[in-house]
Amino acid sequence: MSAKQNILGKLRKSLTGTTPIADDFDVDLVTQPYTYSAEQRIPQLRKLMEAVHTEIHLTSADGWPALLAQLLRDRQLPSLLIAPTTPHGQRITQHWANNPDLPALKSYDRPMEEWKAELFNDTPASLTGTLGAIAATGSLILWPTREEPRLMSLVPPVHFALLKASQIRDNFYQVQQEFEWAQGMPTNALLVSGPSKTADIEQVLAYGAHGPKDLVVLILEDQ
């Protein structure tokens, strides 16, 4: 018998003859304090995210490529990493084609091993989509895919994230229910509230130690 089997056996034996406690979970108790109207969600999300140094911009489905281009110029960023086969990647490619003076585009379209040095040392910014956000906690929901892997939102020092206003949920319970995570947990979903930060024993706060030093969220007011 393995150590694992031995431990589980002891746990099962200890439960013999016991009666499970009824589950008195109260949905309203968990969700009512963290439920918002459509008009409240963006201000609530913005307040919490800006408190941890996230930069928020309100824009539109038509205007966000031009806004992104201006933000890149303002920060003097020489290039932007995109996922070219995503809808937002295609929008950026089209906008850039009509404005050849913009910073260079880099495509995440090959295995990381083929351009690891460039990705880690010469890729200053990236753009990804999001699955939505949670107003109650001020968090983006990132959902890495084969087209848009986790390294895109982790490695470049500046991460631009697109968020549709209609996809801002009230609370984490609503997200779990809507996506039916109880039936099968996602392999790599992330909740991100701000840029990477850490502090040493002297409580000196530093940004960018374990991820982007800047998080810039473009909220598309599509509702």
Predicted regions and their residues:
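The feature marks the mature, well-folded catalytic cores of soluble enzymes
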Residues: 1-223
